[in-house]
A protein has these predicted regions:
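Active-site phosphate-binding strand-loop segment of PLP-dependent enzymes
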Residues: 100, 111-167
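Conserved active-site segment immediately N-terminal to the catalytic lysine
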Residues: 160, 174-185
């Protein structure tokens, strides 16, 4: 988990026991009631504007965290080719590949080289990517401290990204991805809700045995509410989206992140105890 904007927490605090003048908390209202349905519609609208999400992509607010998506992806995306390619840049991409192997044939390529300095070895897979139903990578490995700023070249293949720790950290071209997924607890809000942004044509191909809660088509048709959602987490995410809009969008967020990163690395570089690898 990471820091939530103080302004968001203050607004949530002010509304905690009396949301929209109803005399009750957002945690207590019906998730299918008029006010909460309006909230989730506005939250999606705000996220689409902030992240420049094209019209041919669906936005799902699910549960189960990124680990749930490790299983959902192969159940929904493995098709005629029968296999997927996972780019291993560290712990989380390796963990995703391990889970996916329970459901499909998975090939794995290591794309980091560890020496005096960790570096990315290759991001051009256009010559082999179309042999696979999708190519998966994690652009920010929090455990090993590796962030990949360039988008892998996979030709016309489907690119899937686990952006749990760098979603909404800067502007990106959504159209380069087939699926983006992220646990909320780093940049979106509190733990308990999971964002999935998926291109329309990738929905509706789940294997027959896919549980309904992991079936993207079922969740799309149910407005991400096949079961009772984490209403408070969804509400806080909606406040985060509003706040990002108010402070200038992702360009401003990227500037702030650059300052924070530089401050940290300057300290590490000047320290006699720590070293930057």
């Amino acid at each position: 988990p990471a820091m939530i904007f103080p302004e968001v927490l203050q607004k949530a605090q002010a509304e905690l026991t009396n949301w929209l003048g109803q005399g009750v908390s957002v945690m207590e209202v019906s998730h299918r009631g008029k006010y909460f349905m309006e909230l989730i519609a506005q939250a999606e609208k705000d996220l689409r504007e902030v992240y420049h999400i094209p019209d041919n992509y669906r936005v799902l607010f699910l549960q189960g965290g990124a680990r749930g998506q490790f299983a959902a992806l192969p159940m929904n995306l493995i098709g005629e080719k029968g296999k997927a390619l996972y780019l291993n840049s560290g712990h989380w991409s390796a963990t995703a590949a391990k889970e996916a192997r329970n459901f499909a044939e998975i090939d794995e390529i290591t794309i980091v080289e560890n020496g005096d300095h960790t570096r990315i070895t290759n991001l051009d897979f256009s010559d082999i990517a179309e042999q696979y139903d999708y190519v998966h990578y994690c652009p920010n490995e929090t455990i090993s401290g590796v962030e990949i700023f360039d988008v892998p070249n996979v030709g016309n293949a489907v690119l899937v990204a686990d952006m749990s720790s760098n979603v909404l950290s800067r502007e990106i071209d959504i159209s380069k991805f087939g699926v983006i997924y992220a646990g909320a607890q780093k940049n979106l809000g509190p733990a308990g809700i999971t964002l999935v942004i998926i291109r329309d044509d990738l929905i509706g191909h789940a294997r027959q045995a896919t549980p309904s809660i992991w079936n993207y088509a079922t969740q799309r048709d149910a407005d991400s509410m096949i079961n009772t959602p984490p209403t408070f987490a969804w509400y806080l995410c909606s406040l985060v989206f509003k706040h990002i809009q108010a402070i200038g969008g992702l360009k401003e967020i990227a500037k702030r992140n650059a300052v924070k990163a530089q401050t940290l690395y300057d300290y590490i570089d000047s320290s006699k105890l720590y070293r930057n690898v």
